[in-house]
C-alpha cells in the first residue's frame, strides 16, 4: 500500500467515523429522527400516514353534528396534514429510540404540534417579525435555543396563545401514534409488566430495528472527507477516468453529474481543453507556508482575531449586575446582553469549525508537498474537490498555500508583478498597475521589511489589509526578495481577478465598445471600475428623482452609504439573470449585516425594492445592450421549451454543455420551528422539461460556460508555452 492509497483509505474511514459520531450524537441527544436513515424512514412512510390522518379527520367531521373527539378538533385547526404527519413521525422515532412509554411519546408529539400551532399564529399575526426571527436563528440547530428565542420574541411583541392542556396533548399524541401503527407499521406498542406495574412502550418493530442497525453501520451512506493528495492525482483521460488513486474514491468524476448518458455524450465530443485544464491544475504541486501557519496557530491559541480567523473561544457569560435580584432594569439589561451573546456564539460556531479544519489540515500536510484533485460542473467551471482547504478558499486558506516549485525573479518586470500582488491584497486592486507598482516600491517595501522582521509584533498593521493573511504571506516573500536581490526564487502565488466577468462576456457578445472599456477589455492604461460608475449613476438618479419621489428622497439623504462595496453584489447579479426581487434581497442583506444606520427599517421591502430598480436602471443606462442580449437568450430558451427540449451547446473550448431541468411532483414539508425538512418526490422519472426554470437559468448558465471556456483555453495555452 502506497502513502497515497493509505491516505485515501483514511479519507473514507474519517467520513465513516464522522457519520458514526453524528449518529451517536443524535442518539445521545434523543434526536435520532435527524439522522439520514431516519429521513429515509419518514419519506417511505409519510404518504400512507398522511392519507390515514386525512381519513380520520374526514370521518370525524362527516355526518350529523355532535361532540367531536378532542384529537379531531385539535388536528382540524392545522391547514396542512403533511406537517402533522411529519412532526408525529419525528416524535415517534425519537420516542422509540429513547425507549419512552407511549404516554411520554404522545405528550412529546402533542407538545411539538402545540409549538407548530403557536408559531403559525405568530407568523400569521406578524409575518415580517416572524421571518426576521427565523432567519436570525437559521444558523443553529440547537432546538431549545431556537424555541426559547421564538417564545421570547412572542412575549416581547405581546402575543397571546392559549396553551394546550396536558390532557389534550396526550389525546392528540396517542391518536396519532395509533394511526401511525395501523397505517405505516414501523412501530408498535409493547406492554411490559414489572411487579404490580404495567407500562406500555413505543418500540420499533423487529423488521424496522434490524434495518436501522444495518443503516447505522452502512459504510456506503458515508461521505469521505476529501483532502489533498501526497502523490500527483491521476490525469483525467475521460470524464470517469482520473483523479483519486483508489477505487472507493473513483466515484468522483471529471464532471459533477450523476447522468451517465451525459458523461458518455461529453466524452464523445472529446473535450481536450477541459482535460488539459483539469490536469494542469492537478499537476500543480503545492506546499504549506509554515511561517504563516505558525503565526495563525499562535493567533488562534492566544485568542487574537485577524480577518477570517476568529477567536477560538465562544463569548463568556455576561457578568451579572450586583443588583440583578432587586433591580428590574439591571435584570432586563443582563438578559438582553445574554441574548446577544448567545446569538453571536451561534453565528460563530461554523466559522470556528472552519478555522479548526484549516489549521488542522495545514498542519497535517506541513512537511511534504501536496496536490489537489479537480472537477468541473456541467457548465465547465472548475473547482477543487478538497473542501474548504484549497487555493479557492478564504483568505487564510489561500495564504497557507504556496507553490512547491518556485520561479526565480530575475528582472524588474517580474519584481513588479510580485509587487502588484502585494498591492492587491493590501486593498489597491482597483488602482492602475502603475500606481500599484509605485506603491510596492515605496509604502509596500517599507511595510514588507517592517512586518517580516517580527510579524506577531505588527499584527495591528498587517491585519488592516483587505486580505490580511495573504498580505502577510506577501510581506514575508517580498522581504526575502529585497534581502536576496534578483535570482531569489519566489513561491508566492500572484492572483489576478477578472473585472466583472459577466459584463465582459456581454460586452463581447454585443460588441459594446463603451461597456468593453468599463470592464477593462480595452487596452487602456487607466483601470476602469464599472461598480464605481454604477454607484455614481445610482446617486445621480436618486438626486434627480428626490424632488418628486419620497423613496428617492429617503435614499438620497443616505447616499453616502451607497458605496462601491454596497453596490458590487447587486450589479454582479444582473448578467447572471438576477431579478429585481433578488437584487432587493442583496441590498437588504448588506444593510442588515452592516452597522450602517438608516432612518427606516432595514427590512423595508419598499425601500430595498426601489433601490434595486434604480440599480437596474443605472446599469441599463450604462449598457443598454445587456438587456437586449439577455432577452435574446431568454427567447432562445423559450423556443426550446415550446418543443419540450433541453438546451445544449458547445463552448469555445469545445466543451459540451447540457442544461437539464425536469418537472417532477415534489412537496417540501417545512415546520415553523424545526430545522429539518423533507422532500417527497412522487414522479421522479418524468422527462418533461421544466420550461420556466430552463428559461430563467439559461442566460446565467450560458455566461458561466463562457467563463469556464476562458479558463480552459487560458490553461491550455499556458501549458503549451511551458
Predicted segments, located by residue:
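Non-catalytic nucleic-acid-binding interfaces of large nucleic-acid enzymes and RNP effectors
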Residues: 1-571, 575-708, 713, 717-721
